[in-house]
Structures are given as C-alpha cells and as structure tokens.
C-alpha cells in the first residue's frame, strides 16, 4: 500500500499524515529505520498534533534531518473561515501545494455543549448530479487523499479549540467513489491510539453506489452508514438523482437489506424534502413501505437550495409529512439546517461566501 500515495511522481516526499500505523511501520522499514519509530510518529501526529519535525523533541537531529529530506508533514491551508449566528463554522481549505483546488468542512456544535460534529469532504466537487445539491454544480477536480481528509479534522479542531464528538462524511463528493482513502481516514479517526472516536460516531454517507455498499458489507466496516434516498420511486428518483441510471432503486434497497441483515446494524435513509417533488401522501406511503422492509431510521432534511424554482418546505408541510411517515414505526429525525446563512447547511457546500 505504501506506493499508492507517494505523490504525483517518485521524487516527491512521502506524506506521513493520513497513514495507518501499519503503513507508517512499512515506510520506516523502507527507510532503514526500526518499526518503533512509526509509533512515535503516529502518536505525534494524531495525539500531540505535531505539524513540524522540530516538535518531535525526542528525535535525534540526524533522524529529523532524514525525515525532513524524505517525508512530509503537509497540512491544509485555510483560505476562508465563516461563522454562522448559530455557532456553525465553515472552513474552506486548499492543499499545502497551493494548487488552487478548494474544498470545505463544517463544524456543527449542538448548542448545548454536547454533540459537536464535523462534516468533512471526500472529493473536490462531485461526479454526480444530485439536482438539489450545490456541490454538483462545481467542476469535479478529483479525490481527496487520505491526509487531506484526516487533516480537515485536525485543522478544524485546532482552530476552534475543541474536539469533535462525531464525524460525518457528508461534505463535498461521493465518499464511496473514494473508498480507499475514506476508509483509511475513518480507521484513523476510530483508532484508540489516534483520534479515538467510536465507530458509531463516524458516519459514511452515499448517494447509492451499490458496488461500494457491497464492498462495505464484505469488509465488515464498523462505521455508521447512511443512504441519500430522497425519493421512494425509481422514476421520481431519476428526475433528481442521476445515479439512479447506474444503480436502480430496487438494487439499492436490496443492498440496504443485505447491509442490515449481514452486519446486523440499522441503516439511515436521508430524505431531502422538496415540495411538489417528493412529499405528499403518495410518496410518504411508498417511503413507509420501504422503511417497514428493513431496520432503518429516516432523517428528513428541509431543502436548503433553490434550484429549478424549488423552495424550502414550510414548518407545516414538514410536520404534515413527518406525520404521514409515523406508521412506518421507525425513528424519524427532522434534521435542522445549521449554518444556512454561511452556505454551510446540507446541500450548500460549493465554496460560496
């Protein structure tokens, strides 16, 4: 695995951030060093949050010079930081190389001092065209590397001076289109010797990449899993999510059922409410039937963008739709939209200020 992310060419320094302990051990051996050095670097990066070799005070000058020459501790640059009236903060990052490619992460405090969530990106832009999502309007510029995913959390926590209790892969991009780097980053978040977040506090979301879901099941990944459903009917879903062309709703629901059966864990369906598109009695009834067929919960999310003349549902419309879903007998959460005033709410990440 070492060679996968050495850089754009073999003359680049080896990035060490975003590496698992096993990978760091392999790198140290490749460099002619003892494997225990990997544990020291791993602890320094993820527990002490070191960003320069000078901070590794127990390392000899010769060893630090060697690391400086061959390896990098590259970290993200914050090019913009916006704070909402509700305490949510949005961070726009670019890589240390200064390539001009920007992506975003959002710090979402609960307000009561309890839950503190970081919503992170997995790609720069997105290849999919979910019509309610601002990120879909951006040019796709590639997958984020593991260290760019991990460092979103490290940099946000450093700036806000607090630690996240939860991490959600619900920012820019389709996480399962960057499976390797997303799972590697999640494993670092989960590792007790790194960020030490419980698996149930890490949520990976997908628009419905069925082969990625099956890979997730096969690998028995321990993390929470969410599917962006948004319509209970294949034809209706195709009108708002082009992924329906490749992975049909019946295929997706079968994968979801296999997930709950084989991993024995509940799955979350996310449902962006769009008046006149996917709400009303008929759609609610179909969604109830889906929910009754497997172990799930439903997160309903008011539309935050205004494409195609669509509008955000009123409180009354939201309450009415939720009431129609109650016969499903599953947990239903009306997810609030923090950070809407800074374009940091669900579906709004597009580097807009």
Curated annotation (Swiss-Prot):
It is found in: Cytoplasm. Disulfide bonds join 119-346. Its EC number is 2.1.1.192. GO terms for molecular function: 4 iron, 4 sulfur cluster binding; metal ion binding; rRNA (adenine(2503)-C2-)-methyltransferase activity; rRNA binding; tRNA (adenine(37)-C2)-methyltransferase activity; tRNA binding. Residues 112-341 form the Radical SAM core domain. S-adenosyl-L-methionine binds at residues 173-174, 205, 228-230, 304. It comes from the Bacteria. Binds 1 [4Fe-4S] cluster. The cluster is coordinated with 3 cysteines and an exchangeable S-adenosyl-L-methionine. [4Fe-4S] cluster binds at residues 126, 130, 133. GO terms for biological process: rRNA base methylation; tRNA methylation. Its cofactor is [4Fe-4S] cluster. The active site is at residues 104, 346. It catalyses: adenosine(2503) in 23S rRNA + 2 reduced [2Fe-2S]-[ferredoxin] + 2 S-adenosyl-L-methionine = 2-methyladenosine(2503) in 23S rRNA + 5'-deoxyadenosine + L-methionine + 2 oxidized [2Fe-2S]-[ferredoxin] + S-adenosyl-L-homocysteine; adenosine(37) in tRNA + 2 reduced [2Fe-2S]-[ferredoxin] + 2 S-adenosyl-L-methionine = 2-methyladenosine(37) in tRNA + 5'-deoxyadenosine + L-methionine + 2 oxidized [2Fe-2S]-[ferredoxin] + S-adenosyl-L-homocysteine. One of its GO terms (cellular component) is cytoplasm. PROSITE patterns: RADICAL_SAM. Keywords: 4Fe-4S, Cytoplasm, Disulfide bond, Iron, Iron-sulfur, Metal-binding, Methyltransferase, rRNA processing, S-adenosyl-L-methionine, Transferase, tRNA processing. NCBIfam families: rRNA_mod_RlmN. Specifically methylates position 2 of adenine 2503 in 23S rRNA and position 2 of adenine 37 in tRNAs. PANTHER family: 23S RRNA METHYLTRANSFERASE, RADICAL SAM CORE DOMAIN-CONTAINING PROTEIN. Reaction proceeds by a ping-pong mechanism involving intermediate methylation of a conserved cysteine residue. Belongs to the radical SAM superfamily. RlmN family. This is Probable dual-specificity RNA methyltransferase RlmN.
């Amino acid at each position: 695995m070492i060679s996968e992310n050495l850089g754009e060419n073999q003359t680049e320094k080896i990035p060490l951030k975003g590496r698992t302990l096993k990978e760091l051990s392999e790198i140290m051996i490749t460099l002619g060093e003892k494997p225990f050095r990997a544990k020291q670097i791993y602890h320094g990066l993820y527990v002490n949050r070191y960003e320069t070799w000078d901070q590794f005070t127990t390392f000899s000058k010769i060893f630090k010079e060697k690391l400086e020459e061959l390896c990098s501790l590259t970290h993200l640059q914050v090019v913009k930081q916006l704070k909402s009236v509700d305490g949510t903060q949005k961070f726009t990052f670019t890589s240390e190389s200064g390539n001009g490619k920007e992506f975003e992460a959002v710090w979402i405090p609960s307000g009561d001092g309890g839950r503190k969530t970081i919503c992170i990106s997995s790609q720069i832009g997105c290849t999919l065209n979910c019509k309610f999502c601002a990120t879909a309007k951006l040019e796709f510029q590639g997958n984020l590397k593991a260290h760019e995913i991990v460092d979103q959390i490290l940099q946000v926590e450093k700036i806000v001076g607090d630690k996240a209790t939860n991490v959600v892969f619900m920012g820019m991009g389709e996480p399962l289109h960057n499976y390797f780097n997303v799972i590697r980053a999640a494993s670092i978040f989960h590792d007790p010797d790194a960020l030490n977040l419980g698996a149930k506090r890490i949520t990976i979301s997908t628009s419905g990449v069925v082969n990625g879901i099956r890979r997730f099941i096969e690998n028995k990944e321990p993390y929470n899993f969410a599917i962006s459903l948004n319509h209970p009917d294949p034809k209706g879903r195709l009108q708002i999510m082009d992924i329906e062309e490749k992975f049909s709703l019946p295929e997706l629901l079968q994968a979801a059922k296999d997930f709950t059966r084989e991993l024995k864990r509940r799955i979350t369906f996310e449902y962006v409410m769009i008046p006149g598109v996917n709400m009303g009695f008929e759609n609610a009834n179909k969604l109830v039937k889906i929910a009754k067929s497997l172990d799930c919960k439903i997160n309903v999310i008011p539309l935050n963008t205004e494409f195609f003349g669509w509008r955000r549902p009123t409180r009354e419309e939201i309450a009415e739709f939720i009431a129609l879903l109650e016969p499903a007998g599953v947990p239903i959460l009306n997810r609030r939209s923090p950070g809407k005033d800074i374009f940091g709410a669900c579906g709004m990440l597009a580097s807009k200020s």
